[in-house]
């Protein structure tokens, strides 16, 4: 779920 973490940064 690395993508989910990236979305949080945006």
From Swiss-Prot:
It comes from the Eukaryota. One of its GO terms (biological process) is defense response to fungus. Keywords: Antimicrobial, Fungicide, Plant defense. Belongs to the DEFL family. Has strong antifungal activity against F.oxysporum, M.arachidicola and P.piricola, and weaker antifungal activity against B.cinerea, C.comatus and R.solani. Exerts antifungal activity against M.arachidicola with an IC(50) of 75 uM. Inhibits the proliferation of leukemia cells in vitro. Inhibits human immunodeficiency virus-1 (HIV-1) reverse transcriptase. Lacks mitogenic activity towards murine splenocytes. This is Defensin-like protein. It comes from Phaseolus coccineus.
């Amino acid at each position: 779920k690395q993508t989910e973490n990236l979305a949080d940064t945006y």
